[in-house]
Swiss-Prot record:
GO biological process terms held by the UniProt record: regulation of nitrogen utilization
Uridylyltransferase: region residues: 1-331
Reaction(s) the record says it catalyses: [protein-PII]-L-tyrosine + UTP = [protein-PII]-uridylyl-L-tyrosine + diphosphate; [protein-PII]-uridylyl-L-tyrosine + H2O = [protein-PII]-L-tyrosine + UMP + H(+)
Recorded name of the encoding gene: glnD
Alphabetical list of InterPro entries matching this protein: ACT-like_dom_sf (IPR045865), ACT_dom (IPR002912), HD/PDEase_dom (IPR003607), HD_domain (IPR006674), NT_sf (IPR043519), PII_UdlTrfase/GS_AdlTrfase (IPR013546), Polymerase_NTP_transf_dom (IPR002934), UTase/UR (IPR010043)
Naturally occurring in which organism (per UniProt): Cupriavidus pinatubonensis (strain JMP 134 / LMG 1197)
Organism taxonomic ancestry: Bacteria, Pseudomonadati, Pseudomonadota, Betaproteobacteria, Burkholderiales
Protein name, entry field: Bifunctional uridylyltransferase/uridylyl-removing enzyme
One Pfam family here: HD
Domain of life: Bacteria
Record comment regarding domains: Has four distinct domains: an N-terminal nucleotidyltransferase (NT) domain responsible for UTase activity, a central HD domain that encodes UR activity, and two C-terminal ACT domains that seem to have a role in glutamine sensing.
Database matches in Gene3D superfamilies: 3.30.70.260, Hypothetical protein af1432, Nucleotidyltransferases domain 2
Record function comment: Modifies, by uridylylation and deuridylylation, the PII regulatory proteins (GlnB and homologs), in response to the nitrogen status of the cell that GlnD senses through the glutamine level. Under low glutamine levels, catalyzes the conversion of the PII proteins and UTP to PII-UMP and PPi, while under higher glutamine levels, GlnD hydrolyzes PII-UMP to PII and UMP (deuridylylation). Thus, controls uridylylation state and activity of the PII proteins, and plays an important role in the regulation of nitrogen assimilation and metabolism.
Alphabetical list of SUPFAM superfamilies matching this protein: ACT-like (SSF55021), HD-domain/PDEase-like (SSF109604), Nucleotidyltransferase (SSF81301), Nucleotidyltransferase substrate binding subunit/domain (SSF81593)
Listed EC numbers: 2.7.7.59, 3.1.4.-
Similarity section: Belongs to the GlnD family.
Length: 869
């Protein structure tokens, strides 16, 4: 039998009149309900009354069309559950006793047509009882839908027959396993986190679906289908039932308001709607937080609580459905045992009787081999011990000893801290950490809430110390292996962003928090000083590496003075790599890794007493390049004509591998009449390195950037050099977001880039207008005010041009086109893309700018205009 029928147009006057009357009544009912909800915010009333209004409309349509007496109209899915959100689908089952004849098919088609005419998003199926049972056995979704079936109108006996057969056919244990697998797959789809910046309030972990899964499981097992019933059956405490009801109400309210704000079915809290949604709740922007941040923090707290209680309930239901034949326990101490790999408390009142056991739980979790999680009894005990975790508990010397011991364990720190955060213990011990739980970061490059970012940084730091992960960042792993106290770095990571969102400099405020923590926990002076220094300077190395000229000895010496010694340098380098990697998968790339490693190595040389003045670097670079050339069986003497045209600055700004590569390809093209373009897989490990050698010409840099824009390449770095005889020798690090990172696909386009770019540079056509690239949704929702800063360097020879704006396609070309228009030459370009935000730094020729103040003003104005869209 076909399960879906087409909606046929109604062609009789009585049916048209019926549809018009029912439609008008339903529309009026909806408008009244939406208006009442806007005033009262009682979501339970809204979804129930909206369901009743649709019930009445469907029943009247069913009766008005004189549907068969042996058929039934059944609500299924969420609609069957008895609640309907403003723009949700209305799922119905047209239940028949037998295969329909032609007349019945015609009636059913007219009914479906009327449903659509009523303005309902109808989802319909036509089945007999036997069809339903057969398909439910094959499809867990249909089985779940029938679990919530509710008779709307029609033949009650037929409906009862369906319900009886479905219940008899239902295997609670198999249903539990199927729904658990389905939930895990759904969680994986949403990255297994409730903290996505654009969560789905229905489907994401911690969303409404997680609550529904529990009630489906318990209903299938005959344990109840409401939080009140689960409390009465002993599966929940009264407090847990109240907490679940409260969070369910909030999530439903968010979903209902989201539908109304969007004017359509919308379950994802997209950036575009977060502000309007927050304002519908009455939130307003304050000095430190946007309205959307305040609402989203409330959402994340609710989702976190749902996730926590969901874990407890799932384990409890599993224990009831799958009782273990052997309850073998291993005694750990008088307070804890291991049961089937789970750490379990020996008394329900343990935490109230002995609050020290709260932190001992996580220390044992780290130290005890074979423990893979916390039992339902332990999770419930922690949840119900929240009132014990007060100021007195936080200041207890034994608890401070235990917490520091957790951080000092050689393994298991990441898992322990994540578990402490999931159970809210971490935020109750570190009150300032609690303040950043669920706090969003609208800086366009962090994709995690602050607490999740901090734990991600701790995780990245710990992976440097784990043998199985040494292949990921070998240099970092090498440094970590020789670092005397890795736990110090974990403490610094825990505090580096803890003061976000308070207003003021979070690095300095976080340093105060870290100093207090070190004093309270008896951390020695030397280690405490390092921790606090790391928190205060956790952004310094990234700033220097990505925004300053690392070939400038003054820059390196200044940075070396800040770090002071090798221990501070190594600690800051490891924290910086872990921090940048913990912001977003899009922010870290191999080129940034190379910049940070280069800064580390050259600073280490300075700290070791090595000279980094221009002459010594130039001499060393030439020696290294000659060695590189000989390794390639290339006679260094052949490169002398090219080197004669290169000044000291060139050797300072390029490493020996790059100089050797350029020498081998340009030694016989020193006076080439045509552009020479060479490309190779970047030595940094990602993307391409492209070299351009051509007689210098106006607009050259803009022309090259225009080519890369057209090819959708992202420029990471550019070094621009003019030889003594008037040739431009420019090198670029570029990536293509559409290509894989293994180099294979890049290798396929090397010749294409060389040919196309060389041809473009020969054409000498006028610079085309930059494309008006579109901003992403996130950038449109959280725009950055464009900023341009132009200032001379200390010598006055060059100007440093810094720009920040929302990223978009063609932005770099638009910038370089403005520079070309004003005949301002670029010497270096450091292109720093942070997610949806760009922070670019250019070193430009200062000769014309220094002589003409009006040119500076006009240049800044034109650049600001180019950054706007």
């Amino acid at each position: 039998m076909p399960t879906n029928l087409p909606a046929l147009p109604m062609d009789t006057t009585p049916e048209l009149l019926l549809a018009a009357r029912v439609r008008d009544q339903l529309k009026a009912d909806k408008q009244a309900l939406f208006a009442d909800f806007d005033l009262s915010s009682h979501v339970g009333t809204l979804v129930t009354r909206l369901r009743r209004a649709v019930d009445a409309a469907l029943a009247e349509a069913w009766r008005g069309l004189d549907m068969p007496a042996d058929a039934a109209l059944v609500a299924v899915g969420g609609y069957g559950r008895g609640e309907l959100f403003p723009y949700s689908d209305v799922d119905v089952l047209l239940l028949l006793r037998a295969e329909p004849d032609a007349d019945t098919v015609s009636r059913l088609e007219r009914f479906i047509g009327m449903c659509w005419d009523l303005g309902l998003e109808i989802g319909s199926s036509v089945r007999t009882v036997e069809d339903c049972i057969r398909e439910a056995r094959a499809d867990i979704t249909i089985q779940t839908s029938l679990l919530e079936a509710r008779l709307l109108t029609g033949n009650r006996k037929l409906f009862e027959a369906l319900r009886t057969q479905h219940q008899a056919d239902l295997d609670p244990a198999a249903f539990f396993q199927a729904k658990l697998l389905e939930m895990r797959q759904r969680h994986a789809k949403y990255q297994d986190t409730p903290y996505a910046l654009e969560p789905n309030c229905k489907e994401s972990p911690g969303g409404l679906r997680d609550l529904q899964v529990i009630l489906w499981m318990t209903k299938a097992a005959g344990l109840g289908d409401s939080w009140k019933e689960l409390f009465e059956r002993g599966l929940l405490t009264q407090r847990e039932a109240q907490e679940l009801s409260r969070n369910e109400r909030l999530l439903k309210t968010i979903r209902a308001r989201l539908h109304l704000v969007a004017g359509r079915r919308q379950d994802v809290l997209v950036f575009d709607l977060q502000t309007a949604l927050a304002e519908s709740f009455g939130y307003r922007q304050n000095a430190n937080k946007r309205a959307s941040e305040q609402l989203m923090r409330r959402y994340f707290w609710a989702a976190k609580a749902v996730t926590q209680l969901n874990s407890v309930l799932l384990l409890n239901i599993e224990a009831l459905l799958f009782p273990s034949e052997s309850q073998v326990t291993r005694v750990i101490n008088e307070r804890f045992v291991e049961r089937q790999g789970m750490l379990e408390i020996t008394s329900d009142s343990l935490y109230e009787d002995d609050p020290h056991a709260i932190l001992e739980t996580f220390l044992l979790y780290e130290r005890t081999p074979g423990i893979k999680g916390l039992s339902p009894r332990t999770l419930r005990g922690l949840y119900n011990a929240r009132t014990v975790m007060d100021a007195r508990w936080r200041s207890d010397p034994e608890n401070r000893r235990l917490f520091l011991a957790i951080l000092q364990e050689p393994q298991g720190i990441t898992h322990a801290l994540r578990l402490m955060n999931q159970t809210s213990v971490l935020g109750r011990y570190l009150i300032n950490f609690r303040r950043i739980v669920g706090q969003m970061q609208h800086d366009l490059f962090h994709v995690y809430t602050v607490d999740q970012h901090i734990l991600m940084v701790v995780r990245n730091m710990r992976r440097f110390a784990i043998v199985e992960h040494t292949h990921e960042f070998p240099f970092c792993s090498q440094l970590m292996a020789s670092f005397d106290k890795p736990w110090v770095l974990s403490v610094a990571a825990l505090f580096h962003d803890i003061a976000k969102g308070r207003g003021g400099d979070h690095s300095k405020l976080g340093t105060v928090d870290a100093r207090r923590f070190c004093k309270q926990h008896g951390i020695g002076r030397e280690d405490a000083d390092l921790i606090c220094w790391l928190v205060e300077h956790h952004l310094t190395m990234s700033h220097v590496a990505q925004k300053q000229d690392l070939t400038d000895p003054d820059v390196v010496h200044a940075f070396a003075r800040v770090v002071g010694d090798e221990r501070h340098l190594t600690a800051l380098y490891l924290l910086t790599v872990a921090d940048v990697r913990g912001t977003s998968p899009k922010v870290w790339n191999a080129w940034k890794g190379k910049l940070l490693e280069d800064l580390y190595r050259i600073t280490l040389r300075v700290l070791g007493g090595a000279r980094v003045d221009p002459h010594s670097i130039w001499a060393q670079r030439q020696e290294e390049t000659i060695s590189q050339l000989r390794l390639k069986a290339f006679d260094p003497e052949l490169g002398k004509p090219l080197w004669a045209q290169l000044d000291v600055a060139f050797f300072l700004r390029h490493d020996s591998r790059d100089i050797a590569w350029l020498t081998r390809h340009l030694f016989n093209k020193v006076d080439s009449p045509v552009p020479v373009v060479k490309a190779r897989i970047s030595p940094a490990g990602e993307g391409l390195q492209v070299a351009v050698y051509v007689k210098d010409q106006p607009d050259l840099f803009a022309r090259i950037c225009g080519y890369f824009e057209r090819k959708a390449f992202s420029i990471q770095d550019a070094k621009i050099h003019t030889t003594r005889h008037g040739y431009a020798l420019d090198t670029f690090q570029v990536t293509d977001p559409g290509l894989a990172d293994d180099g294979g696909n890049y290798r396929d386009i090397l010749a294409l880039v060389e040919h196309e770019l060389g041809d473009r540079l020969q054409q000498q056509a006028a610079l085309p207008e930059p494309s008006q690239g579109r901003l992403s949704r996130q950038s449109r929702s959280f725009p950055i005010k464009p900023r341009v800063d132009l200032r001379p360097d200390e010598r006055g020879q060059y100007y440093l041009l810094s720009l920040s704006a929302n990223d978009r396609t063609g932005l770099l070309y638009a910038i370089t086109r403005v520079l070309a228009k004003h005949r301002v030459s670029v010497h270096t370009a450091r292109i720093n893309t942070l997610g949806e935000r760009v922070e670019d730094v250019f070193l430009v020729d200062g000769s014309r700018l220094a002589a003409d103040n009006r040119l500076q003003i006009q240049l800044e104005q034109d650049l600001l205009a180019a950054l706007e869209i």
